[in-house]
Amino acid sequence: MKFLRSVYAFCSSWVGTIIIVLLVIFFIAQAFIIPSRSMVGTLYEGDMLFVKKFSYGIPIPKIPWIELPVMPDFKNNGHLIEGDRPKRGEVVVFIPPHEKKSYYVKRNFAIGGDEVLFTNEGFYLHPFESGNDKDYISKHYPNALTKEFMGKIFVLNPYKSKHPGIHYQKDNETFHLMEQLATQGAEANISMQLIQMEGEKVFYKKINHDEFFMIGDNRDNSSDSRFWGSVAYKNIVGSPWFVYFSLSLKNSLEVDAENNPKKRYLVRWERMFKSVEGLEKIIKKEKATH
């Protein structure tokens, strides 16, 4: 009993509380707020998430806000305990290669060894395991549209049917922006190579080993791996657990919050305590009724 009272007293103290909170943040879950519209369709600006820190191993613990590691990266893979790698199609939280203290959330489009094409039609994926096996494609991507490039079978928008939040604008503005950057000598601002293939211009990238090509579900309003490159495993933080709170922000187009200040900071009750899978079920129901 004396031991339990001592434990209770420690946990009730300021020092004990701080240590417990830090342990939770280091090893279990951390709260983040989504500021941008890059994942709109699935996750919205103003969504407040708990991120599961142990989805892909345990990242090196960092002091919140200043992002200072509390220990060296002995394995040089950014993780105290190495774990599973993000799978294709999963929503992942990570630190992008061009930042050190910012956290992004995107969908993992491709893994190491895969080949990616970004065209005026959308994204194409050539999974490295498939080779040229049509049976592999039909088994893993049933009913998907395919196209042959460089003698290889590529799958068009492979996750769109399963994840209904993924969408493009009709005119694919991002493709034209990237084409403009590439032709004006600003290739340093994009990570994909502009090439001529089968009579059309496409952007191509082969993903390096243990790296991941991260793309926003709002394909035409997303700063992602098309611009700053694929993400190494050492930068992977975790996966969204659930939305614990959600507010409309100034950039919330659905309620025209920029022009109507009264529409800012409205609570989105229907999004609270929903996982990504739960939010996708809502999207499917909404689409089914329209």
Curated annotation (Swiss-Prot):
PROSITE patterns: SPASE_I_3 (PS00761). Signal peptide: none annotated. Its main location: membrane. Residues 1-13 are cytoplasmic. The chain crosses the membrane at residues 14-34. GO terms for cellular component: plasma membrane. It is found in: Cell membrane. It comes from the Bacteria. The active site is at S38, K106. GO terms for biological process: signal peptide processing. Residues 35-290 are extracellular. One of its GO terms (molecular function) is serine-type endopeptidase activity. Keywords: Cell membrane, Hydrolase, Membrane, Protease, Transmembrane, Transmembrane helix. Pfam families: Peptidase_S26. It is a single-pass type II membrane protein. Its EC number is 3.4.21.89. It catalyses: Cleavage of hydrophobic, N-terminal signal or leader sequences from secreted and periplasmic proteins. Belongs to the peptidase S26 family. PANTHER family: CHLOROPLAST PROCESSING PEPTIDASE (PTHR43390:SF1), SIGNAL PEPTIDASE I (PTHR43390). This is Signal peptidase I. It comes from Helicobacter pylori (strain J99 / ATCC 700824) (Campylobacter pylori J99). The gene is lepB.
